[in-house]
Amino acid sequence: MLCSGSLRRLDLPDKAAVASGAGFQGISVYLHEVRDARRDGWTLASLRRMLDDLGLAVAEIDGQVSWLPGEPTSERAASVDEALEVASGLAARSLTALEWNGHRVGVDLDAAFVVDAFGELCSRAGSQELLVHIEYFPFSGIPDLSTALAIATGAACENGGVMVDVWHHVRGADGGDPDVLVAAAPMVLGVQLNDAAPEASADVRDECMHGREMPGAGVAACGPIAAALRRGGCRAPFGVEVFSDALDDRDPDDAARRVREAARRVLRGR
């Protein structure tokens, strides 16, 4: 599955065409790029027909969703209503839940409050058979696997779990440890493959958005991480998300082929 951020300079219709041409069977879709497409005259129905014609399923609806009470919507942050409308219209498998303001759960945000909010989001998503996964990342208020798992297990919703992004797992408190993922694997509903440079940047946000490596090209144990998840019983689709200025500069068709082949090598244990 091609994660949208790997071809972030393309609009959604062009991105879908490139993904299909490279052999992907699914993509993730950002809410803001659906907004852009609708402004250009597309409807959810016409976007879905286009994706169907290309043989692409929408594996994830990604991006900022204001699921915590009190969070405002914006050009980048969609309401829960909008996110669920898009997910339904595009027949998406899952929805990502992020805490992007850096309000630390258990410090700035009451943990029980967050658990209740996630449970409410899962309840609403469940009415349309949509999975929801919390994506943890180092500069989030949900910075590591244990925090994300505590929220998901506390909410105790059948359709709720966590997203594992390899770069986030490496650069955060988990330090890229594959072993901690075995027990967590049944709760892992989404996986994003990528890799990390040998030396962490002083600006982790900048590295996150501009300096990720292709799967297998850095210091992350991509293969062991994927194997640990499979060994533990994870059945989520594996996506590839490489935010990289170097990748942005490549021809999109070439970039898509490269990320697909890199992910396939990792998953085959090469």
PLM regions with names:
Residues 5-12, 30-43, 66-76, 102-108, ...:
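Acidic-and-aromatic substrate-binding clefts and catalytic sites of carbohydrate-active enzymes
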Residues 15-18, 43-50, 79-86, 114-121, ...:
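A general structural detector for well-ordered alpha-helical segments in enzyme core domains, enriched
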Residues 19, 27, 51, 87, ...:
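Conserved, mostly hydrophobic/aromatic
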Residues 27, 59-61, 119-219:
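Acidic/histidine-rich catalytic cores of soluble enzymes
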Residues 28-29, 59-61, 93-99, 132-135, ...:
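Short beta-strand segments at enzyme active-site cores
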